[in-house]
Amino acid sequence: MSAHRVLLEVCVDTPAGLAAAIAGGADRVELCSALALQGLTPAPGLMAQAASAPIPVYPMIRPRHGDFCYDARDLDAMRRDIDAVRGYGLPGVTIGASQANGALDLKVLRKLVEQAEGLGTTLHRAFDVVPDMSEALEIAVELGFERVLTSGGALSALDATDRLAALVEQAGERISIMAGAGVRPGNIAELVRRTGVREAHGSFGGPVPGADPRSQLGAMGFVPPELRDTSQAAVAEAVKALRAL
C-alpha cells in the first residue's frame, strides 16, 4: 500500500462532466471551458453549479487560448475572474503565466497569487515550457503554490517519469507535484509507482452522442470532429487503480 493516499483531480468543461467526475469518485475537479484548447476560464453559470459540489473545485483562470504571456488587459480579466471564484465560494484556482522565453512570469504570478489570497492555488502547465524546471519549482514554492500540474515537459507524463520523480524528490513536503497529460485508467498506477507523485490529473473523457460533424452544424463550425466528455466509468476505474496501490 502507498504511504500516502494518491489524490485524483479530474478536469471537466461541462455540467455533465462535473457530475460524472463527482459520481466517479474524483477527489478534486479542475473546472474549465474549452478542454479542446487545454482549458479556459469557465462560465459563471458552471462555477455557480460547482459551488454546491461535495469535493473541492478549482476553476482554471486562463482568459484566452494561445500562450501564457499576459498583458495588462489579460491580467485585469484574470483578477476579476479570481474575484468571481471567491464570490461563488469555490476554494481555489488554477493559474499560470509565462515570459516570452517560457520562464515563469514572476511579476504577473505575484499579482495573481496576491489576488487569490485565501484561496488554494495550483500552478498549471505553463510550468511545462520553462527552460529550467528545478528553478521554476523553487519559484512556485516561494510564491506559496499548493501544487504544480506538470507532465515533466513531455506530451505524456509517462514519457517523463524520471524528470517527474526528480521533481517529487526536490519538492519534498514543501509542494505537491501533480502529474498530468496522457493519464488514463490503464496507466495511472504505473505513473504513480514510477514517479512517487501524490496527485494525478486527467480528463478521463469518452465519446458522447451529439450532432454529426458532417451535418450543417458541423459545416458551420459548431461541432468538433469528435464529441467527448468526462466518463464516470473511466474516472471510477482510475480511482480503483489508485486505491489498489
Swiss-Prot record:
What does UniProt list as this organism's lineage?
Bacteria, Pseudomonadati, Pseudomonadota, Alphaproteobacteria, Caulobacterales
Q: Which organism is it from?
A: Caulobacter vibrioides (strain NA1000 / CB15N) (Caulobacter crescentus)
Please identify the protein, giving its name as recorded. PF03932 family protein CutC
Q: Which Pfam families does the entry link to?
A: CutC (PF03932)
Report the locations given in the UniProt record. Cytoplasm
Keyword annotations for this protein, in alphabetical order, are: Cytoplasm
The keyword Cytoplasm is annotated on this UniProt entry? yes
Q: What's in the GO CC field?
A: cytoplasm
- In the record, what terms sit under GO molecular function? copper ion binding
Q: Which domain of life is it from?
A: Bacteria
